[in-house]
Amino acid sequence: MVEEGTMERLRTLGTLGTGIGWRPEIADAVERMPGIDWVEAVAENVCPGHLPESLLRLRARGVTVVPHGVSLGLGGADRPDEGRLAALAERAEALGSPLVTEHIAFVRAGGALTASPLLEAGHLLPVPRTRDALDVLCENVRIAQAALPVPLAVENIAALISWPGEEMTEGQFLYDLVERTGVRLLIDVANLHTNHVNRGEDPAKALDELPVEAIAYVHVAGGFERDGVWHDSHAHPVPQPVLDILADLASRTTPPGVLLERDENFPEPGELERELGAIRKTLEKAGTRAGASAGAAGAATRTAAELTVAESTAVGAIAGPRRGGADAQAAPRAAGTEALSAASTSTPADPARQRLALAQAALLSALVAGTPVPEGFDRVRLGVQARALAAKRADVVAKVAPELPEILAEEYRPAFLTYAPGHPMTGGYRRDALDFAEHLLLAGRPEDAEARRRLRDWWLERSGPTPPSRHPAARLARATRRVLLRR
């Protein structure tokens, strides 16, 4: 159990029930599904001023919506970006959410701390379980807690690779994080299964070491195994081993909420409903009820159904406001801003940040820029991770710039996978799409003249802040010169 001093700084939050990840591709199906108590939406895919009609209808029916962030990089060496924190806060307020969630991961590295180019991973990468990394993570979490108008929960991630020289198990790392910050946990049982296959970690041992009273809710998802490596794809059915880990967790505590994640390769709605049914059945067999109310918990036994939320922040025990439904109250933004400012200018963890920054930059550079593999890492596994990052990058670029696979047809994917290793992403996926198109044009590709013309027109329309020139050939020539001068 977390020490009493931390528990005294926690408040009760209601249960969530059974939910599913809301995605635009299945929005209509989710609205029609019976027994959906709540949904989770990727925060970066929601615009606060133009909420999707589907989410508005769900909210009107009383369905809770939780924003789930993927780009904050709380496990990174840098302090959380104030703009990203503000954006996450806006989404929580717009959706009337009772909490927000993010990941224990780093997503970018380099920059000022290492005096090297900033690199984007385009994916969630594992944090080393060291005291340095824990110190940095704790401060970053406190900064986020001070900036957000609702409680924060953080998720354990799936990993293909292991850091050398780790000093703690995952359970110990999470326990200390909760003890020092009071942050809530989003436990992904599919990620525990991934780490079992890929890193030889025992899910039962991880659950033994977790502070289960800190669990906000649970993720369940599917994946696939290839050549002895488990890929947490969120594009395949939930396998039995993942349900078995869910049953183990549910036998220890009542999960306040359980959510099914599916991000790709969406099946018919009936299949998703059957997966939700399997989750409910698993919980019932474990002697729990996912939709139990907080009031059902006995006063003599503290369980995770008595969902608690930390009020500690980066500057001590400043109480952060809770927001949700009709009882939501305005956040004292001035106090939160002062807390964020104080945390952002503090320097106790700076030596740890610099050590972590160098380690993360070396790893990410090896993964996305082809630099030498840092000492102690498994070269084969890093190769698997590098290929997975490139493949995901190709998939996301195809989504944000669907014209590219349309123009390039079957040439798109092999061309991008050839391009990616020598051209790391530095400015987001839209910039990545433009850089990829520019790279092809400078190489005189594609060979088909009509496809090359269409690609050139697409690039010219999007490559600058000003409208396309009346002389596109001259503009392309100037851009070519800029690129050549950078070499």
From Swiss-Prot:
Region UPF0276, residue ranges: 1-285
Family named by the database record: In the N-terminal section; belongs to the UPF0276 family.
Region (Unknown): 286-487
UniProt feature, compositional bias: Low complexity: 326-348
Protein name: UPF0276 protein SAV_2218
Region described as Disordered: spans on this chain: 319-348
Pfam short name (any one): MbnB_TglH_ChrH
